């Protein structure tokens, strides 16, 4: 598995759990995650931006489906 896919899985898993636990500010969650990934230096800026977009998109979908299931 490449590094982008690995980070994607880790971030979606951890951030989804935080959403389940009551955090609701997706922008803040994604920004914190972006900063953590940037600090590792393992991905290029372009990879980080693509990763961030994908994570944000999927978290927003998760949040909508989670709210609908309540």
Residue ranges and their predicted role:
Residues 4-70:
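Amphipathic alpha-helical membrane/lipid-surface binding segments
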